[in-house]
């Protein structure tokens, strides 16, 4: 089947959505707006940069909304088409696709990996996707609800056996859903709070995770059984975690109360799901004791049942399930979790493992008495769900900046009459911290007064310890140190954990209930990470602590700040080198490395396809254990639909298996070559951002100042007032360049690096780069991700934004430098890859972009005009509203902007 034929169903869906949206816009806003939308849709090539029709303010706002809604509907249709193509592959019996479990496992089998080796890896594996709240998540929950309705009706329209009457009825439902979206405000008229973000974060579990994760485990066990002929009972090593409600560095509004609220709200979602499933099992398991026996444990549960109706006397499974529902309600009540049901006074479960025990008793009884088929359905899925989600739904990470920890430790020392902590050098800090960690005495005294920040931080750690007692130790798993630069930064966190009981002494040995995770973010910190970890592992006290964590040490790597600090190529290379060095440090120390990749949605923040990125990791850096962040609008794109969520989680697991056990060629890289490229790229990037006036240029040539005024997220755009890019958070930095369509963080510096290398080494140098591209997954992924950025960028639209800069000489100078680097980067890409055009090897993405670009370009041009108007009239709320519409529409069209 040709690529054209494969896309016919997608084009049919888009035509249907386009027609219905045109009808809605025409009926609601009139022919002028509807005609303008259709005119934009037909713009091609150079026409896309032509001026747009002048409309009255209200009509212009409607035009912006229509462009944005078209992008949203396109995303829905495209996601459904991906699901449809995957299903078509499976029905046709085609070879498994790259990134799928069957493909990954077949490769391992062909590589000679034994069942024992695979099972051993999975027995100690840990794969995590961690949801984070970010200011680039621009869509309201109400809009996402509307998207689900559109997705549902469009999917039903694709059924092959619809009658004309059924099709007409479904189209009417679809049009109503589009009309409801049109009449729903997509703009938040209030600033989001952390509570709002917590509510949004848990919304994806009933949408996708409750269905997708158990299905993924079943599929993995089935595929292993078919390929190796052995039964695989796997532990629950795949987890979805969260930062929402625990990330104080990301959001200074987070406190102990919000941490408790986050876990309680998550727990509520888990309990409601379990009770719903128990009720469904109650309806299904109507087995009569007259016809089939039940095990002793089931009968014991049945005897405790509050359901004493005569009609239930011979239905032991239903009575047992009634007992379990009562115990579960009592468990929720004990933990302060509100449920929309009556409470029960019976004994609660002490932890989720007791619930699993009861469910396992039902399963064993069914299997022992000829009903294994019943045990393998909903009951089996529920057992897996409880094992994965526990009573806390998602493990929550805590994160805070190293400087904040340092301040709290300094205050504790001062109040206790100890050394002036801030005045100590690194060696002295390590010495006094180890001294305090080795003694049972606490520094905190309830009889002394502490500063507001110290009280707040200590309260967070105490609340974390209480949450572990209430919901299980896994409910709070990691404590992350942002901007970690030294051993003392890690030990300072350890001391605060000790003050709260998260680290304690047992028989003189330190024991921790959380992982202490250094986050290396800047280029300098990445370079120093090897020395920090080697010095940490040399401490006898820390060696003992590591023993209590099965010698597993997590290290987080920051893609966003390293990119903002050093540019795209240097960031990628420094991350690679840091991983390679850490693998050796950990091997020397006999520790098990678990890397946590702080990747964003955009390429400038480490984004790109997860499968390719993981498979291209340095040898030994995965070893069955990896966590990655899922941020901003990427969460919606990846996890709002069960099939798509399942595919993304499957790719994460497949890549982990291949990177850990597979024979991946080209894992080595030419260190000298990349050192040279990195040095040139870094010099070019720093020369740009250190140009006098660059910060003024950035503030005026992007919508960053307007973004700061919008009600997108709950956290500030910067940690302090802006005087340099170092003061700016990485997310608005990347987000703003994406909105102006320059995408600078995803490519700048690569062109200069390649040009300098080829100038020095001649044709042989270019040949070496071409050879490296063909054989190095690391280099392939780097250039492939950059290619996607270049394809989405538009220099013409970026030039319009540059014209907003008041200092025309500064604008001409800086945009001239950017344009020159842009051309160098294009030349370098084509010279190395041999391609004639961008996305030559990815026709699906190329066609997708071609369809989106007319609307994306129109939104970009309008945004630039609106920014000029806002700067002339800063208090014009209508203009700010219109800018917000362009930001929403551009985000939807690009799909990964921050």
Swiss-Prot record:
<dbReference type="GO" id="GO:0000287">
    <property type="term" value="F:magnesium ion binding"/>
</dbReference>
<dbReference type="GO" id="GO:0008964">
    <property type="term" value="F:phosphoenolpyruvate carboxylase activity"/>
</dbReference>
<protein>
    <recommendedName>
        <fullName>Phosphoenolpyruvate carboxylase</fullName>
        <ecNumber>4.1.1.31</ecNumber>
    </recommendedName>
</protein>
<keyword id="KW-0460">Magnesium</keyword>
<keyword id="KW-0120">Carbon dioxide fixation</keyword>
<dbReference type="GO" id="GO:0005829">
    <property type="term" value="C:cytosol"/>
</dbReference>
<dbReference type="GO" id="GO:0006099">
    <property type="term" value="P:tricarboxylic acid cycle"/>
</dbReference>
<dbReference type="InterPro" id="IPR015813">
    <property type="entry name" value="Pyrv/PenolPyrv_kinase-like_dom"/>
</dbReference>
<feature type="active site">
    <location>
        <position position="134"/>
    </location>
</feature>
<dbReference type="InterPro" id="IPR033129">
    <property type="entry name" value="PEPCASE_His_AS"/>
</dbReference>
<dbReference type="InterPro" id="IPR022805">
    <property type="entry name" value="PEP_COase_bac/pln-type"/>
</dbReference>
<dbReference type="Pfam" id="PF00311">
    <property type="entry name" value="PEPcase"/>
</dbReference>
<dbReference type="GO" id="GO:0006107">
    <property type="term" value="P:oxaloacetate metabolic process"/>
</dbReference>
<dbReference type="GO" id="GO:0015977">
    <property type="term" value="P:carbon fixation"/>
</dbReference>
<keyword id="KW-0456">Lyase</keyword>
<feature type="active site">
    <location>
        <position position="564"/>
    </location>
</feature>
<comment type="function">
    <text>Forms oxaloacetate, a four-carbon dicarboxylic acid source for the tricarboxylic acid cycle.</text>
</comment>
<dbReference type="InterPro" id="IPR018129">
    <property type="entry name" value="PEP_COase_Lys_AS"/>
</dbReference>
<dbReference type="InterPro" id="IPR021135">
    <property type="entry name" value="PEP_COase"/>
</dbReference>
<comment type="similarity">
    <text>Belongs to the PEPCase type 1 family.</text>
</comment>
């Amino acid at each position: 089947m040709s690529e054209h034929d494969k896309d016919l169903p997608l084009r049919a869906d888009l035509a249907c959505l386009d027609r219905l949206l045109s009808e809605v816009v025409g009926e609601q806003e009139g022919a002028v707006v509807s005609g303008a939308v259709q005119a934009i849709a037909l713009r091609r090539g150079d026409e896309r940069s032509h001026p747009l029709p002048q409309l009255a303010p209200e009509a212009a706002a409607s035009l912006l909304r229509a462009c944005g809604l078209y992008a949203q509907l396109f995303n829905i249709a495209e996601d459904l088409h991906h699901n449809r193509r995957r299903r078509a592959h499976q029905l046709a019996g085609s070879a498994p696709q790259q990134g799928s479990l069957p493909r990954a496992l077949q490769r391992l089998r062909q590589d000679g990996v034994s069942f024992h080796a695979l099972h051993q890896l999975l027995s100690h594996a840990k794969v995590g996707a961690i949801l984070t709240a970010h200011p680039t998540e621009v869509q309201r929950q109400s809009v996402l609800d509307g998207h689900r309705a559109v997705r549902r009706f469009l999917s039903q329209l694709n059924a092959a056996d619809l009658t004309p009457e059924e099709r007409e009825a479904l189209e009417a439902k679809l049009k109503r859903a589009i009309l409801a979206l049109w009449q729903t405000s997509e703009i938040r008229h209030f600033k989001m709070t952390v509570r709002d973000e917590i509510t949004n974060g848990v919304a994806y579990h009933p949408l996708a995770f409750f269905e997708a994760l158990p299905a993924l485990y079943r599929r993995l066990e089935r595929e292993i059984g078919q390929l190796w002929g052995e039964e695989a009972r796997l532990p629950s090593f795949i987890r979805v975690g969260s930062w929402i409600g625990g990330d104080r560095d990301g959001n200074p509004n987070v406190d102990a109360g919000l941490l408790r609220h986050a876990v309680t709200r998550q727990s509520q979602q888990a309990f409601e799901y379990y009770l719903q499933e128990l009720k469904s099992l109650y309806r299904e398991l109507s087995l009569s004791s007259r016809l089939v026996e039940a095990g002793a444990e089931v009968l014991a549960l049945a005897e405790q049942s509050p359901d004493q109706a005569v009609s239930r006397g011979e239905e032991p499974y239903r009575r047992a399930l009634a007992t379990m529902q009562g115990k579960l309600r009592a468990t929720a009540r004990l933990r302060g979790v509100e449920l929309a049901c009556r409470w029960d006074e019976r004994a609660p479960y002490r932890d989720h493992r007791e619930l699993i025990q009861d469910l396992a008793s039902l399963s064993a009884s069914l299997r022992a008495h000829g009903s294994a088929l019943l045990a393998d359905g909903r009951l089996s899925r529920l057992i897996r769900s409880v094992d994965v989600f526990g009573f806390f739904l998602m493990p929550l990470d805590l994160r805070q900046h190293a400087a904040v920890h340092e301040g709290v430790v300094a205050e504790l020392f001062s109040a206790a009459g100890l050394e002036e902590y801030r005045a100590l050098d690194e060696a002295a800090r390590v010495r006094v911290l180890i001294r305090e960690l080795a003694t049972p005495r606490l520094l905190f005294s309830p009889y002394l007064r502490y500063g507001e920040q110290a009280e707040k931080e200590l309260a967070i750690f105490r609340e974390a310890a209480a949450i572990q007692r209430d919901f299980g130790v896994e409910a709070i798993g990691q404590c992350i140190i942002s901007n970690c630069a030294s051993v003392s930064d890690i030990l300072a966190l350890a001391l605060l954990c000790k003050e709260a009981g998260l680290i304690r002494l047992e028989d003189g040995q330190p024991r921790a209930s959380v992982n202490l995770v250094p986050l290396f973010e800047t280029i300098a910190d990445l370079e120093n990470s090897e020395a920090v970890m080697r010095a940490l592992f040399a401490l006898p006290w820390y060696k003992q602590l590591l023993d209590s964590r099965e010698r597993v040490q997590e290290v987080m790597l920051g893609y966003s700040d390293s990119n903002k600090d050093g540019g795209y190529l240097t960031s990628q290379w420094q991350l690679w080198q840091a991983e390679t060095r850490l693998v050796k440090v950990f091997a020397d120390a006999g520790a098990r490395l678990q890397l946590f990749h702080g990747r964003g949605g955009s390429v400038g923040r480490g984004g790109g396809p997860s499968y390719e990125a993981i498979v291209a990791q340095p040898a030994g850096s995965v070893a069955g254990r990896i966590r990655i962040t899922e941020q901003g609008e990427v969460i919606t794109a990846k996890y709002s639909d069960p099939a798509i969520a399942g595919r993304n989680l499957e790719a994460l697991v497949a890549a982990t298996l291949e990177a850990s056990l597979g024979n991946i060629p080209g894992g080595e890289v030419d260190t000298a070559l990349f050192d040279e490229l990195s040095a040139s790229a870094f010099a070019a990037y720093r020369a740009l951002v250190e140009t006098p006036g660059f910060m003024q240029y950035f503030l005026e040539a992007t919508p960053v100042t307007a973004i700061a005024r919008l009600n997108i997220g709950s956290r500030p755009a910067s940690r302090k007032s802006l005087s340099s890019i170092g003061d700016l958070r990485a997310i608005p930095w990347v987000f703003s360049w994406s909105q102006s369509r320059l995408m600078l963080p995803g490519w700048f510096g690569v062109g200069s690096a390649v040009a300098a290398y080829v100038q020095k080494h001649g044709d042989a140098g270019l040949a070496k780069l071409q050879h490296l591209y063909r054989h190095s997954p690391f280099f392939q992924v780097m250039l492939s991700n950059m290619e996607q950025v270049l394809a989405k960028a538009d220099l013409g639209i970026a030039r319009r934004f540059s014209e907003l800069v008041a200092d025309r000489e500064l604008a001409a100078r800086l945009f001239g430098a950017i344009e020159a680097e842009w051309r160098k980067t294009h030349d370098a890409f084509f010279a190395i890859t041999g391609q004639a055009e961008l996305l030559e090897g990815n026709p699906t993405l190329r066609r997708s972009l071609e369809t989106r670009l007319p609307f994306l370009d129109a939104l970009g041009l309008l945004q630039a005009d609106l920014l000029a108007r806002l700067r002339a009239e800063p208090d014009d709320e209508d203009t700010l509203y219109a800018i917000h519409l362009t930001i929403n529409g551009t985000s939807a069209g690009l799909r990964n902007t921050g």
